[in-house]
Amino acid sequence: MSETYELKAETRDRVGKGSSRELRRNGLIPAVIYGDKQPPLSIALSTKDVTMKIHAGGFMTTVATIDVNGEKIRVLPKDYQLDPVRDFTMHVDFLRVSKGSQVSVQVPVHFENEEKSPGLKQGGALNIVRHEVELNVSADNIPESLTVDLTGLKIGDTVHISNVKLPAGATPVIADRDFTVATITGRTQEAEPTEEAEGGEEEA
């Protein structure tokens, strides 16, 4: 599980596009805390602090504490919006979580020991079907990533979710099938020379 962190925030009395634009001009990001059978809470956070956490990695899989005017609230980031042109954070949604809460989280998949895969050594390719897997997991036990060991995999082999070690108590959101995470595909055949190219060689 990623190390938790704390952000300071203040409540927002006004909502809407005009209010949000004003916050951004002042170096703040509008955000909402929702869930846990409580009414949504509109807040504003430091743009600099949130951007640093997003760029540090693991933002969507790390439970954080938000200090809202002295009240400590445990949350899990559920979504954030980026400006498509200027690439800065425009808004964040946080899910309120309590001790032992079950949450659904998209967890990134990492692959290791590629050099120990006979299929890859023979020129095969790693075809990643799922870069992330959505898990139902305790908010206190969210993994930073899932690891797939490629040792011994040959061309034609498939990695299913059942082959991936999950944290204790975690289950895939997709529960009705043993879905594919990755495959080792065969070597790409070189394109055959065209008739035009062959004819050119004969003339030469």
From Swiss-Prot:
The keyword Transferase does not apply. It comes from the Bacteria. GO terms for biological process: translation. SUPFAM superfamilies: Ribosomal protein L25-like (SSF50715). The keyword rRNA-binding applies. GO terms for molecular function: 5S rRNA binding; structural constituent of ribosome. Keywords: Ribonucleoprotein, Ribosomal protein, RNA-binding, rRNA-binding. Residues 1-20 are annotated as: Disordered. GO terms for cellular component: cytosolic large ribosomal subunit. This is one of the proteins that binds to the 5S RNA in the ribosome where it forms part of the central protuberance. Part of the 50S ribosomal subunit; part of the 5S rRNA/L5/L18/L25 subcomplex. Contacts the 5S rRNA. Binds to the 5S rRNA independently of L5 and L18. Belongs to the bacterial ribosomal protein bL25 family. CTC subfamily. This is Large ribosomal subunit protein bL25. It comes from Rhizobium meliloti (strain 1021) (Ensifer meliloti).
